[in-house]
């Protein structure tokens, strides 16, 4: 997904870079130290170029023994100074660059946590990972590494030009006639690098997304013998990425060749004009050698300044992608009403909602009441709007019209953090995080609870049997996404987490749909201990699990078309009765 805000889409490269530099402000003293080091490097290099005159005249022409003795020592001292200055520059710049990359990663992840749910529907996780990974690194390169090259090489060029002007301003000014051509080449190269860099970052995200999709679903890929088709898909995207990379290399090579050609033209002009000046007696052999050495030193510096455009423009392209996230509007959080512990009285009043880019509403005029201490089951065919309805309660999405009230007040009146503290969620796909069982139960704001509380909820969630059998018990590492545990075990840990939170509102999103009979029995038993004295909303796939619900809402195409108890709805012989009979292969009587 190409997500660029309108402001950033039209931001000039200089404006973007200037904004990038604001992130370096915190590390300005490191940059000052680095600049001093770069200046010392340039002075040492320029002094060496200036010494070419006495080396030539005094050593080879005048044969001055005294000068021949101290000049080698002076050159060693200059390069020692240059090496120390270079080390200081590299260390200071490197520390600043890595710090800025870290700051960007933290800022962008923090921002993602504040974005509305629609953002996560519209942008693949792979694209987010590219922003947090390579984009942040490219930005550090642009802010610091590119700056280091530009400062170092610019100072080297300036130093060499000062030496050249000192020995012959006429020759130097004549050579500077090629400067406009050089500036034109660098401007064209920068523009092309910037355009290609945008495409490369998007291509990297698509590559990561394709690999993540194939590897995450490796079992389906193998069972359906889809390896070849997935490889073809990945190879096609990799070829696009390769083509873009070749364009970058082509641009770099052509620009380097152009700079070298212009340098050769300048060198030829130097030979021509310097020869004329020497014949007129205005240029000594030492002057000529200093001019020639300085000109030769300028050419690689100019080449590096041209090549740094790739790093700089890639960083600017990455910065625009990062700023498109940082400039996105946060989810609405304007409530001011204090909320300690809610009673849990939920009321939907004429709620209509639709997803961005879709014309048909996902919910259409939905109204119902869920009282504290009751269980409200929500059933219906796939795509009827059950999960969309549930997602409105924690305000992952905002309705288009209507109101949702908690304890008589609109949800928007409460702070988001306070509202979400009232809700515990147990879904079908339980997400555990890489860490211990104890850390996954006492998750988030609950991480300071005592171990006795964790042990209590493990017992209540019917998880003690398998936890006690694990080598480290509660300290057992569950692996990435809880991969070292079974589905039923992960589900019981999710219930333990909800028990520990002790929130007045409980949302169960098909919590037993994917479990075997034994695991379902254990989970259902744990849920029976979790649900009392809470407002419980259950999305149910297996209708046999909601027979004792206080009310059942039957949804179809975003509307509630039936409501009542299990017995009442069976007696009506409507959609609920049909769905129930389909599960048990017979019409109820």
Curated annotation (Swiss-Prot):
Please report the record's description of how this protein sits within the membrane: Multi-pass membrane protein
Q: According to its UniProt record, where is this protein located?
A: Cell inner membrane
Family annotation (Gene3D superfamilies): ABC transporter type 1, transmembrane domain, P-loop containing nucleotide triphosphate hydrolases
What main location does UniProt list? Answer: membrane
Principal EC category:
translocase
Instruction: Write the record's keywords in alphabetical order, separated by commas.
Output: ATP-binding, Cell inner membrane, Cell membrane, Lipid transport, Membrane, Nucleotide-binding, Translocase, Transmembrane, Transmembrane helix, Transport
* Domain of life where this protein originates: Bacteria
Binding of ATP, residues? 380-387
User: Domain comment?
Assistant: In MsbA the ATP-binding domain (NBD) and the transmembrane domain (TMD) are fused.
Q: What does this protein do?
A: Involved in lipopolysaccharide (LPS) biosynthesis. Translocates lipid A-core from the inner to the outer leaflet of the inner membrane. Transmembrane domains (TMD) form a pore in the inner membrane and the ATP-binding domain (NBD) is responsible for energy generation.
Q: Which NCBIfam families match?
A: MsbA_lipidA
Q: What is this protein called?
A: ATP-dependent lipid A-core flippase
Species of provenance? Xylella fastidiosa (strain 9a5c)
